[in-house]
Amino acid sequence: MNFKCVQFQSIFNILFILIISFPGGLIYLLTGSTLSFWLRESEFDKITIGLFGLVNFIYILKFLWGPLLEKISFSTLSNRGYKYCLVITLINCIVCVYVLTSFNPNTNFTPFVLCLIVLAFFSSIYDMLIQSSQMLLITDKNWGISEAACTTGFRIGILISGSGALYLSTIISWQDVYRTMAILCIPSLLLIIFYPLKFKDKMIANDFDKFFSAFYDFIKKPKWIVIISFMLLYRLQDSFLSIMPNMFYLDIGYTKQDLAIGYKAFGMCAAIFGGVIGGFLCRKYEYSYLLKRVLIYHALSSLSFIYLYFLNQDIISLYIAVFCQEFTKGLTMSPFFSYQLKCCSSRYCITQIALITSITNVGTILIGSISGYAATYLGWSYFFIVAGLCFIPAYILILYLPKTINSV
């Protein structure tokens, strides 16, 4: 990797972002894909499992407490305020995962769901802080690289709580699996506590009574409605697929062991590779060109599901299908998240990033919650055809995105 343009301190900051992103990915999957396997073994049907995606509706609302986080993080405590927010939030996430293991989803349904909601709440705050840290610690010319690092850390977390958790579930109970995942977050917590944070610019806390300042600043940007619409629809394909590939692979005969290695582990490596490639492509190509290309590649990857369904279901075909899907997914994410940072002003980075990612999560959560219905009533072949066509609205919007955005 070419780090000639990256200052020495920036390298450590990028590595810091990579490591603290790990718990974000690990916890995220514990309320999503990995949870679906636990629920499947607890004999919940596909429709109910799909509706569990609504637990993550809290991610849509996170922009509401963005101004409060900015007030706390950029207070007179300076960098320490931001660090305190990271530490307290991650501790609460770890505690919530442990508490979740006290409940059985069949016999303690209500407290189980409530605990998931609280976990999603703290996880959404942690997600906001991680993403804003890139604007605070990294120069804008290196956002593509820092986003690749963030994606890599996030994906490694997903790998552990996906493939690792799935494999462990064949040996120990799901409750013990979740306890193990919570323990794995502790090293990142220790790093946050002891790492010397130093913002590239001095940050000043915004007055909390000026709650709408961040939103007003955003709508002054050129074509802001197009930007918001694009954020909502860019991940429509992934939102529509949601956690249904898990059910698809099981339905066509693959075992949990096959999926732990072939889908979760290999797929995550492919996604990380795609994310790194996408991050460095951000330094070479302008955003509109790159976003269009990677969107098309990812749309074509839906053909791999249809290939598996109709033609071949051996282990090699699984690896090919998973690589096509996950590599292109990773390829789309680095330029997309880097573009999100480009759309934000540094003074309001936490609130505006929360706003943009909340908009993105509207599609991910609401569309994802009906994926079970779609898969049930369309059948797998038509379901994946529709998923492949989901790129069209975002592709059209890319043509109308503003050429330049003031992100100061």
UniProtKB/Swiss-Prot annotation:
Predominant subcellular localization, coarse grouping = membrane
A cellular component term from Gene Ontology for this protein is:
plasma membrane
Topological relation to the membrane, as annotated: Multi-pass membrane protein
MF terms (GO), sorted A to Z: transmembrane transporter activity
Cellular location(s): Cell inner membrane
**Which InterPro entries does the annotation name?**
AmpG_permease/AT-1 (IPR004752), MFS (IPR011701), MFS_trans_sf (IPR036259)
> Is GTP-binding included in the keywords of this UniProt record?
no
Query: Which residue ranges does UniProt annotate as crossing the membrane?
Result: 11-31, 49-69, 84-104, 110-130, 154-174, 177-197, 224-244, 261-281, 294-311, 315-337, 353-373, 382-402
What Pfam families does the annotation carry?
A: MFS_1
Which of UniProt's keywords are assigned here? Cell inner membrane, Cell membrane, Membrane, Transmembrane, Transmembrane helix, Transport
Which stretch is the leader sequence?
Answer: none
- Record has Cell inner membrane as a keyword: yes
Protein family: Belongs to the major facilitator superfamily.
Q: What protein name is recorded for this chain?
A: Putative transporter AmpG 2
Q: Which organism is it from?
A: Rickettsia typhi (strain ATCC VR-144 / Wilmington)
The gene it comes from is: ampG2
